[in-house]
Amino acid sequence: MPQKQKVNVKIGDSVTVISGFHKNETGEVLKINRKNGKIIVKGINFKFKHVKPTTENEIGEIKQFEAPLHHSNVKLNLKKVL
């Protein structure tokens, strides 16, 4: 049974991607999956899914969604309070 991983960000936090294709991009945390240590960040890591039509009257479509990132690939943005 996999253990839950400690994730140092919360929903609504501003984070910066520190590695990978989207390096140095910032976004807001939308969802956290502690079971596998992945988070979904708003506006980062878009993927496309091609959906076939299921009936004759329906048409196929391309759905765009934000894929999860591993929590070790992001860092928390700290705002300095004066």
UniProtKB/Swiss-Prot annotation:
SMART domains with a match to the protein in the record? KOW
GO biological processes: translation
InterPro entries, sorted: KOW, Rib_uL2_dom2, Ribosomal_uL24, Ribosomal_uL24_CS, Ribosomal_uL24_KOW, Translation_prot_SH3-like_sf
Record's keyword terms, sorted: Chloroplast, Plastid, Ribonucleoprotein, Ribosomal protein, RNA-binding, rRNA-binding
Where is coiled-coil annotated? none
- Keyword Cell membrane on entry: no
Q: State where the protein is found.
A: Plastid, Chloroplast
Which GO molecular function entries does the Swiss-Prot or TrEMBL record give? rRNA binding; structural constituent of ribosome
Q: Does the keyword rRNA-binding apply?
A: yes
Q: What is its main location?
A: plastid
Q: Name one GO cellular component term.
A: chloroplast
Family listed: Belongs to the universal ribosomal protein uL24 family.
The protein's role, per its UniProt record: One of two assembly initiator proteins, it binds directly to the 5'-end of the 23S rRNA, where it nucleates assembly of the 50S subunit.
Oligomeric state and interaction partners are given as:
Part of the 50S ribosomal subunit.
- Read off the PANTHER family from this record: MITOCHONDRIAL RIBOSOMAL PROTEIN L24
For this entry, the protein name equals Large ribosomal subunit protein uL24c
